[in-house]
């Protein structure tokens, strides 16, 4: 039994499967006689006091502001590594996924605004369909096994990382509330201290962890969303070291990855995906927020990714990865419409102070759009890869 669990956890698809199970469990509880218990659990107040410092939030916000800061720390570490020595370390490597990611953010936002522009209650959610859930998307890709070209996986990963950078910028610029200058000054001091530690060659993680905690608290109190602290911390932690030394950034990334995959993201999905369908029907998908998010993910994402990629290649600003064709790019473009945890997260920011119905409709659009995108992409990519394999076998026999 233990061996079977270890084998499951070692599979690339395990993270995506756990996310699906977490979403299913949340939906089941939210629409069962246990709905009150589920909501009460999320509303449980959790208070931390240390002298004059007082942080008092419901459990749901500890998940969204605290655990997701660790997730964004992991994203920051991955982005930094890819920028320095990975899939984004040169113009030639980064050009195609960069154009694809830009298109994949612009088009969904335009589709959403097409249904919600001028609607004060809903137009603030324009960024919801701009996000891609990389864990879920890679999980779907992993279900296809070794048939998926490595270059196609790298393209999706690079695209999603650039997409994450875009989401980080969007959160910082558009979803920050009234700012506290005192807290921002403390945050700046913490950042400056970590930069100095890096420049002085300090490779021990403990001082970065202590200053990172101070930064998270300061950002939490500043009005800027606390998850951004994770990204800043990641960029301050040293990546390059002398030969024979262990990279603190790589060590932390490796250590955080299983926690993110098997605890943070499933817990976030469980806490945020519990949408009560009471009073909802198929007609609810026609609500502006639901329709904008659903079609933004289902149509806007693939159109943006594909059109911007095609234009970049035709204009010779980028080139297709070796061994990858347009059919495969098209299927992956649809897969980018899997927004799930990232879209739900942005929804929680966009409609934090709005009527409950608006946030619920946005989550409904996210769940339906993401599931349809994942299903279509899986079957499309299966067909494309089978066709490619058939052509390869024919060429070998001829």
UniProtKB/Swiss-Prot annotation:
GO BP: any one term: regulation of pH
Catalysed conversion reaction: Na(+)(in) + 2 H(+)(out) = Na(+)(out) + 2 H(+)(in)
Keywords from the UniProt entry: Antiport, Cell inner membrane, Cell membrane, Ion transport, Membrane, Sodium, Sodium transport, Transmembrane, Transmembrane helix, Transport
InterPro entries: Na/H_antiporter_dom_sf, NhaA
Topology term for the membrane: Multi-pass membrane protein
UniProt keyword Cell inner membrane present: yes
Primary site of residence: membrane
Residue ranges crossing the lipid bilayer per the database entry: 17-37, 59-79, 95-115, 125-145, 154-174, 179-199, 213-233, 262-282, 288-308, 331-351, 364-384
Leader sequence residues: none
Cellular component annotations (GO), alphabetically ordered: plasma membrane
Sample GO molecular function, one term: sodium:proton antiporter activity
Locations listed in the record: Cell inner membrane
Top-level taxonomic group: Bacteria
Purpose of the protein: Na(+)/H(+) antiporter that extrudes sodium in exchange for external protons.
NCBIfam families: NhaA, PRK09560.1, PRK09561.1
Family according to the record: Belongs to the NhaA Na(+)/H(+) (TC 2.A.33) antiporter family.
Protein name (Swiss-Prot/TrEMBL): Na(+)/H(+) antiporter NhaA 2
Organism (species): Shewanella denitrificans (strain OS217 / ATCC BAA-1090 / DSM 15013)
Gene: nhaA2
